[in-house]
Amino acid sequence: MYTELISHKIAELKKERKAVILAHNYQLGEIQEAADFVGDSLELARKAANIDAEVIVFCGVHFMAETAAILSPEKTVLAPEPKAGCPMADMISGAELREFKARYPGLPVVCYVNSTAEVKAESDICCTSANAVKVVESLKSDTVLFVPDQYLGAFVQAHTAKKIISWPGYCPCHARIKPEDILNLKKHYPKAKVVVHPESRPEVTALADGVLSTGQMVTYAARADVKELIVGTEIGMLYRLRKENPNKLFIPVSEQAVCANMKMTTLPKLLASLENMQTVVSVPEEIRRKAVGAVERMLKVT
């Protein structure tokens, strides 16, 4: 009853504020239910760029709301939980990227969207896990600097003839997934397919039937030949997969694959965000102008 009351208030305020709620696939189920659109980073970036709304309420982590603010400076972007950060995004700063570039002068920088606006501003083009290979292939250079995720960089390296020089960042959540997690589950579910996120270690991706972004996992799970699926990503993903495929079995590869930051946004916080129009996420115009080029170039590639 309490949840229904809050959800009703959120729906009313959303209309009043001319707001749209975007939520990442890793968000709590109650947040996914309240959202107008649930998706992966690429899908959410596209929505933020084209959505017809005065206010975007972004239920995810800080860099996602920042990306929306970069793409839609005329809109008000709200983060219901401003403390929801991303450990991987914090593994490289703008200054560190400038030093990295100085060591390899002239090489283009591909920046994973899981990064700060300052880092995007120092990059040539952004990518997501859904389009990283395509983005790298779009560049003329035979050698590319890739930040901040070394494991996504390794995945791209396995699918391109170009040389990838990666920054040594990683997602702690996906790094917790081990090969033995998959091997043990395959003993219990021998007919199950295995999908993992490309932020996973190479020894994990080597065991998968598909190495996919969360949006691509949604498509894969809907296939008629998939009855049982071992899912190697943050466990919030299973809520959507089970909801959209109620007659299929979804098994998390590891109960340890939890992103605490993704779980910080709750219905009461979402309601408070709309009531008080907080917390507004903005990017200094000098940084935004430089960063928007990298994000828009990515969207043109895909």
Swiss-Prot record:
UniProt keywords (A-Z) are: 4Fe-4S, Cytoplasm, Iron, Iron-sulfur, Metal-binding, Pyridine nucleotide biosynthesis, Transferase
**Cofactor note (record):** Binds 1 [4Fe-4S] cluster per subunit.
Residues binding iminosuccinate are 24, 41, 112-114, 129, 197-199, 214
What residue stretch is flagged as signal peptide? none
Q: Does the keyword Ribosomal protein apply?
A: no
Where is [4Fe-4S] cluster annotated to bind? 86, 171, 259
Known catalytic reactions: iminosuccinate + dihydroxyacetone phosphate = quinolinate + phosphate + 2 H2O + H(+)
* SUPFAM superfamilies, alphabetized: NadA-like
Q: Which Pfam families match?
A: NadA
Gene Ontology molecular function: any one = 4 iron, 4 sulfur cluster binding
The compartments listed are:
Cytoplasm
> Which top EC class is given?
transferase
Which Cys pairs are S-S linked?
A: none
**Which cofactor(s) are needed, names only?**
[4Fe-4S] cluster
Q: What's the name of the protein?
A: Quinolinate synthase
Q: What is the organism field in this record?
A: Dehalococcoides mccartyi (strain ATCC BAA-2266 / KCTC 15142 / 195)
Lineage of the source organism? Bacteria, Bacillati, Chloroflexota, Dehalococcoidia, Dehalococcoidales
